[in-house]
């Protein structure tokens, strides 16, 4: 029971323990350290759980128990008197929110079982019941709640929907873009706009490249806290700032000088090699050595004296001098080994080459950028207007609305800040600036709890910015008064073999330049238990490389996908694990960088009978055969003269016309017509008036008649029925749904067809009607090279898992294979014609006409694409950001493993040393080398080569073709089947007899205790009421639903576009209103309207509430005035829980419910319940709800040990409020 009231009706105050002081936390840490528990909490975990009263940033390494810490902290808050609904808990995914809620629920149940204090049990039970309504979820979900409740304050209806289908978004975007593009092409600044379009698309007819530019700018702006302000103030920031050589950032100059000095140092190391050949046979310096010494000396001098010799203004001159000094090639050869000494410097020189010329023309592109800024701003506003009109928004819109509500309404913002005791965020490293702004508005400035790991920030494509986490980390370390940093380093997931190789790799690879964090001692993984440190020699990490000196010929042509030989290596290792060590398939996971080009893995595994479950691939729903057949069927129904669709339908299994049939039909041309469609030829063939009627034999004629009859019925039905019903009619008429069940991948095919019907139904429910619009929408999706989400089907559990690294985040697996390690990182974005940056704005490649510079007179123009200075700055930052994220992806992949990690790739064994750098600089790989290497494999090989004297905890092994023969790979061992002829130990009949006896006993028990079996553990008064209804009918008591049935069964057609309001929703809204209504004020229409804004219901439901009737209850009835007179004794919407005994099974069960209102006096209780049911006579409702009110009265009497002297029903379903005493 949840009433915290004593026997006299006075509230009981639970004495909660205070929050722990720093000294108490230290004492607890010491006690934990000295305890004899098998699994102890670490000192840092204890600190993270119990520290309070300030902002806290928890940097939790992989496997360090961050979820455990969050759950324990939440439970501790609850035990210290903080209600669960006063905690804001943000998770990255809906799944994570569900799991967190379940863990909290289990903890509360456990705590209730352990607690002996009755009042604490009541309090914890209240928390358990409030858990479902607590703010535990994604930022998107919370933003929707804010907008649903307060959207009216910024003019947004609470009746909105989320556009989750990218195809629908693209269709609306295309409509807005086309209209806006036409307007700009006819405006006053049209010549500048045309130049802008030509700069990206080449001509004004093909606008696809320009459209992509606009869409990308729009999407990028949506991840900022205020898109409009960002577009107005930051979009052209770099274009305005970087216009001269002096404007180049110092950091970029430092990187160039560092590359020059590194090149000099590397060249010196090469010249010092024993086999280099410094001297000729005569003993004098060799020409090569003299030349290299000159390069070393000049590069060192220019770096040392850069400011006095050149400075920023002379940067262009420095680039020319260095270019003329060093050789054009990258390598220096010593004893037939090539060392790429000059490669990095050449890349840097390329970045700065032609700066003077670029800056000369860069100013010409500024008017184009201003036009682009105007267009994107106009597009953003127009697109939003369309979405407001449709009342359909993207998630980013809803979050921006929520930010606007909190920024513009001080009272709403303060109410949230006062309400939340703490603002908790999981996966903080993946927040974007929009989400960060929302969190800042919800916090009071000193109550944030953020958990994350910057080393696992891998969602840059969602505009996540790890620098948000990084900045907080730096700020809190420099200024502890702003917040506290707690490091969770202990890993409780992986064996030492995995931890050691992870530390070895990333201590040589990751720092703030690449990776965004220095992987030093405070970030290294430490085993959390002694069991993890027990060594297993066979679990040492392996880098297995297929030797590509002799290519197997099975690799994809673009060499980006995984090859057959690499997959065979994996299959061989899995067979060995399964056969020799008994590792179940489900303990093995394959991780890949992307979902595409993985079919070869499934195909190869099938050859070796290894079961595999894939995470899916490219979205090809609309391109699946069965869906294409149905879409062409719908196209034909919409327009039979569409020859392509018609032929596809005729050739489909539904009608099975072959090539010969189609050829005969095609010859039925009307010679008088120039153009004749296939549908007309079919009609002429049926009536025998084609050019060659003799070709139409009886069998073909019969097929044509069936086809035309079926098509006619479908076309007629399409005009009257829904799309959903039409699709199912097609399935049933031609048995197509059943047909695909007999084909390969039958389950997937049927799921796809079923989903097509559901999507058509969803399409019509969203306000779009008709077959034509549906077909048009699908075609637009295909035109934009998009697709609809694939349909998932059930997968086997005992199988190897194949998933992307992104999908694996947060999961763990005993054995992990990281595949395709030789795949180059995608650098597509840094080669686009534009690059966006949050601080700098946009940088573009400008198509300049350099005819005047060249003095050309014969050509009309000489166009050259130039990388403007803002573009180069953004490009460098984007390159480093991409490499940093790839490094973090590798960290995530490696730390998923519990026992062993494998790296799989391919490389040329004879060339494997070419990538290495001969200079060892400290503990890290040289920055220039890390920037130069573009695969996981290259990083690992470079570390293995340069730090070969260390134990790196992984071995490199090349696999030859001879290792991958059928005999070498082997086969899975299958268990020995029982020999049916061997009856020596066959006791089958005895076993069956015993099983039958057991089944009979179980059946008898089930029969004896049937009532108890079907008895729910928890029941509600409404359920009991429903159970009594069948018993009331035979004795002449009418059930209200039956007595109030309309006399006519005819249903009038519903033409109104208004949303139908359910009676149950009105009832819920009335109860909410009666709960929040302030009784200390006079009850009038204004009071009721003010209270109405506070309830969580949509506008249609609020409008349906009869406020005059509610006002009449309080003003015109004695009970309503009783409410106002004795409001201090009034309890509203009070939950209760009592133990009952089922009369049939004699088993106990819990009865839970919520009492609308009751008045608690010293010697008695008055019970009130509101009803909105429609009725003819009040006696009907009195009989219907008598049992329910008796249960309420019993609960109150058990709780307070006082009689319930009066029970009232307040009936709001009639013409006026009526009071019935029960």
Curated annotation (Swiss-Prot):
The keyword Aminoacyl-tRNA synthetase does not apply. Residues 524-810 form the UvrD-like helicase C-terminal domain. GO terms for cellular component: cytosol; DNA helicase complex. Residues 39-495 form the UvrD-like helicase ATP-binding domain. Coiled coil: none annotated. Belongs to the helicase family. AddA subfamily. This is ATP-dependent helicase/nuclease subunit A. It comes from Streptococcus pyogenes serotype M28 (strain MGAS6180). The gene is addA.
């Amino acid at each position: 029971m949840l009433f915290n009231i004593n026997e006299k009706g006075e509230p009981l105050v639970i004495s909660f323990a205070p929050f722990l002081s720093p000294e108490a936390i230290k004492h607890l840490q010491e006690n934990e350290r000295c305890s004899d528990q098998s699994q102890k909490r670490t000192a840092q975990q204890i600190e993270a759980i119990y520290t309070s009263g300030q902002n806290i940033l928890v940097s939790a390494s992989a496997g360090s128990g961050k979820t455990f810490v969050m759950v324990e902290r939440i439970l501790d808050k609850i035990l210290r008197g903080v209600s669960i609904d006063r905690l804001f808990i943000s998770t990255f995914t809906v799944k994570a929110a569900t799991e967190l809620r379940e863990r909290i629920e289990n903890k509360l149940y456990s705590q209730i079982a352990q607690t002996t204090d009755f009042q604490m049990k009541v309090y914890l039970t209240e928390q358990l019941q409030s858990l479902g309504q607590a703010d535990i979820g994604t930022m998107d979900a919370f933003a929707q709640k804010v907008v649903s409740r307060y959207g009216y304050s910024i003019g947004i209806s609470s009746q909105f929907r989320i556009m989750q289908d990218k195809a629908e978004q693209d269709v609306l975007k295309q409509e807005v873009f086309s209209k806006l593009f036409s307007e700009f092409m006819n405006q006053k600044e049209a010549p500048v706009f045309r130049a802008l379009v030509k700069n990206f698309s080449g001509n004004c007819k093909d606008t696809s490249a320009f459209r992509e530019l606009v869409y990308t700018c729009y999407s990028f702006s949506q991840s900022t806290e205020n898109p409009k302000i960002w577009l107005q103030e930051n979009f052209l920031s770099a274009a305005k700032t970087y216009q001269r050589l002096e404007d180049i950032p110092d950091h970029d100059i430092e990187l160039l000088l560092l590359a020059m000095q590194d090149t000099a140092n590397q060249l010196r190391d090469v010249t010092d090699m024993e086999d280099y050949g410094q001297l000729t046979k005569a003993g004098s310096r060799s020409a090569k050595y003299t030349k290299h010494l000159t390069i070393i000396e000049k590069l060192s001098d220019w770096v040392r004296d850069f400011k006095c010799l050149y400075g920023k203004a002379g940067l262009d001159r420095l680039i020319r001098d260095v270019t003329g000094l060093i050789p054009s090639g990258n390598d220096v050869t010593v004893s037939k080994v090539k060392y790429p000494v000059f490669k990095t410097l050449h890349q840097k020189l390329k970045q700065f080459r032609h700066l003077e010329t670029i800056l000369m023309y860069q100013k010409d592109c500024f008017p184009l950028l201003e036009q682009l800024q105007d267009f994107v701003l106009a597009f953003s506003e127009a697109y939003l207007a369309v979405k407001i009109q449709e009342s359909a928004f993207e998630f980013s819109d809803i979050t921006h609305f929520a930010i606007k509500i909190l920024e513009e309404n001080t009272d709403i913002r303060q109410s949230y800040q006062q309400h939340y005791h703490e603002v908790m965020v999981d996966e903080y490293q993946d927040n974007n600036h929009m989400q960060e702004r929302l969190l800042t508005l919800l916090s009071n400035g000193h109550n944030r709890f953020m958990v994350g790991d910057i080393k696992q920030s891998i969602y840059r494509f969602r505009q996540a910015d790890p620098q948000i986490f990084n900045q907080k980390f730096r700020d809190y370390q420099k200024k502890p008064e702003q917040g506290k940093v707690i490091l969770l380093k202990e890993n409780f997931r992986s064996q030492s073999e995995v931890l050691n190789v992870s530390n070895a790799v990333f201590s040589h690879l990751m720092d703030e330049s690449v990776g965004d964090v220095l992987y030093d001692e405070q970030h290294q993984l430490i085993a959390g238990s002694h069991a993890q440190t027990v060594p297993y020699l066979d679990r040492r990490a392996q880098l297995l490389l297929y030797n590509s000196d002799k290519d197997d010929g099975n690799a994809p042509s673009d060499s980006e996908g995984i090859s057959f030989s690499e997959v065979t290596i994996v299959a061989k290792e899995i067979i060995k694990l399964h056969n020799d060590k008994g590792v179940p398939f489900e303990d093995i996971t394959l991780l890949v960088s992307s979902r595409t080009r993985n079919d070869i893995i499934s195909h190869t595994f099938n050859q070796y009978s290894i079961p595999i479950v894939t995470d899916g691939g490219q979205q090809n729903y609309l391109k699946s055969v069965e869906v294409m057949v149905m879409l062409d069927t719908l196209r034909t129904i919409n327009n039979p003269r569409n020859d392509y669709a018609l032929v596809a339908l005729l050739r489909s299994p539904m009608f099975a016309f072959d090539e010969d049939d189609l050829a005969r039909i095609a010859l039925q041309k009307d010679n008088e017509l120039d153009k004749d469609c296939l549908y007309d030829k079919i009609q002429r063939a049926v009536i025998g008036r084609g050019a060659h009627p003799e070709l139409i034999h009886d069998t073909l004629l019969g097929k044509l008649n069936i086809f035309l009859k079926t098509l006619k019925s479908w076309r007629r039905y399409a005009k009257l029925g829904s799309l959903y019903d039409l699709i199912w009619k097609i399935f049933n008429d031609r048995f197509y749904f059943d047909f695909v069940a007999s084909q390969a991948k039958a389950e997937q095919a049927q799921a796809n067809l079923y989903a097509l019907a559901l999507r058509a139904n969803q399409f019509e429910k969203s306000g779009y009607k008709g077959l034509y619009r549906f077909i048009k929408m699908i075609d637009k999706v295909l035109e934009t090279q998009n697709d609809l989400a694939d349909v998932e089907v059930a997968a086997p559990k005992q199988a190897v898992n194949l998933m992307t690294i992104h999908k694996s985040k947060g999961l763990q697996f005993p054995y992990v294979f990281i595949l395709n390690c030789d795949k180059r990182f995608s650098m597509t974005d840094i080669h686009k014609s534009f690059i966006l940056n949050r601080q700098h704005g946009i940088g573009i490649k400008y198509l300049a006409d350099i005819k005047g510079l060249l003095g050309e007179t014969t050509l009309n123009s000489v166009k050259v694409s130039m990388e403007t200075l803002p573009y180069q700055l953004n490009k460098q930052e984007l390159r480093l950001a991409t490499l940093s994220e790839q490094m973090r992806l590798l960290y995530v992949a490696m730390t998923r493993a519990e026992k062993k990690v494998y790296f799989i790739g391919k490389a040329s064994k004879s060339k494997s040393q070419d990538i290495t750098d001969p200079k060892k600089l400290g503990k890290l790989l040289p920055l220039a080398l890390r920037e130069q290497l573009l695969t996981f494999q290259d990083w690992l090989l470079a570390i293995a080569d340069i730090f070969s004297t260390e134990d790196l905890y992984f071995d490199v092994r090349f696999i030859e073709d001879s290792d991958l023969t059928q005999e070498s790979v082997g086969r899975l061992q299958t268990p020995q089947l029982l020999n049916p002829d061997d009856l020596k130990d066959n006791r089958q009949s005895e076993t069956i007899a015993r099983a039958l006896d057991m089944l009979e006993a179980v059946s008898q028990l089930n029969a004896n205790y049937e009532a108890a079996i079907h008895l729910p553990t928890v029941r509600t008064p409404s359920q009991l009421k429903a159970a009594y209804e069948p018993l009331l009918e035979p004795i002449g008591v009418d059930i209200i639903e039956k007595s109030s049935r309309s006399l006519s069964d005819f249903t009038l057609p519903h033409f109104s576009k208004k949303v139908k309001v359910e009676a149950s929703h009105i009832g819920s809204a009335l109860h909410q209103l009666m709960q929040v209504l302030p009784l200390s004020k006079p009850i009038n229409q204004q009071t009721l309207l003010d209270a109405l804004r506070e309830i969580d219901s949509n506008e249609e439901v609020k409008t349906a509430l009869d406020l005059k009737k509610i006002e009449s209850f309080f003003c015109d009835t004695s009970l309503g005035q009783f409410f106002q007179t004795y409001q201090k004794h009034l309890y509203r919407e009070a939950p209760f829980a009592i133990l009952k005994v089922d009369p049939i099974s004699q088993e106990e069960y819990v009865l839970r419910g919520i009492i609308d209102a009751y008045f608690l006096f010293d010697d008695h209780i008055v019970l009130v319940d509101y009803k909105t049911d429609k009725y003819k006579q009040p006696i009907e409702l009195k009989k219907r709800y008598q049992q329910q009110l008796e249960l309420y009265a019993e609960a109150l009497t058990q709780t307070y040990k006082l009689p319930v002297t009066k029970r009232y029903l307040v009936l709001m379903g009639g013409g006026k409020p009526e009071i019935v005493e029960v």
